[in-house]
Amino acid sequence: MSNRITFAVVTVATLVGGAVLWQIHNQKEIPRAAAAVTVAAPAPPVRTEERKEHDDGESREMAARAIEATKRPVDTKKTAAVADAGSPLRAGETWQYSAIVSMLSSVANLRLKVAEKRNFLGKNAWHLQAFAHTENPFRMVFALDDQFDSYSDAATLVSMQYEMHLNEKGQTVDSVQRMSPAVREAAPADTIAARVLPGTRDPLGMMQYLRTVDWAKTPEVRSPVYDGHKLYDVHARLQGRGEPVTVPAGSFNTFKIELQVLDNAVEMKDAHFILYLSNTEARLPVLLEAVMPFATARVELLKAE
């Protein structure tokens, strides 16, 4: 799977629904071990290192694939800024989404959840989750049941640990990556140390971070985002305020946010993302539009709890 497709899969799946969107067109067979740690060069300064061997040969293959990059394409200035003091995150929040591709009916469903605020590695952290599943009839040809877990700093939503538990077409991959800006910080057993830039967020943390931004005062934010494979630079820009949006969950006035994704300082031209956040204190992610060369996708909010 190409790096661009990998990012789109994780972004669409974990931000607002349906890892299937890019895989419909581009899915290839992925070795179980490779999927957990692949970082293609040239890349931003991310490296993954296996600190301890797993009980099977897969972990040794993971370690063999670990690489260290040398370029620094992202501007990390203020990327770890403290989230809005009036953060809208609440423990137990859950959102249900449906992913629609072009003229097809729902091909996947997604559930996002703010599971809890807890102590993690001695710090206050949010435990964020996403669950993606394909639906019939597409499920008959591509069965997908994925879960993503993020432990993100409660103040900044900077990633501390990112987990991918993938089950796609009967093939399973489990990856637990500890975010580590420090060069020699050890990772515990069954965990990979991912060397990332300070202030790096994972896709789940980035989604929630966008909710904390006061878009009436801040027209643009930037952040490095690590998707479990590679580091990207994400620029989020306010494109409109009071945009009317209707989805199954209801009608909303929204902030229209353009998401620009840069791979090694070069903008990804083959995908264009627009995120709509409700113009309320909750700033609910109500709709994502993804325009791709082969299809247009809408990920719509079905229900918020």
Feature names for model-found ranges:
Residues F7, L15-M179, W215-E305:
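Acidic, serine/threonine-rich low-complexity disordered tracts
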Residues M1-V12:
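Membrane interfacial helix-start segments of signal peptides and signal-anchor transmembrane helices
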Residues M179-Y226:
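Active-site/ligand-binding surface loops and adjacent short beta/alpha elements
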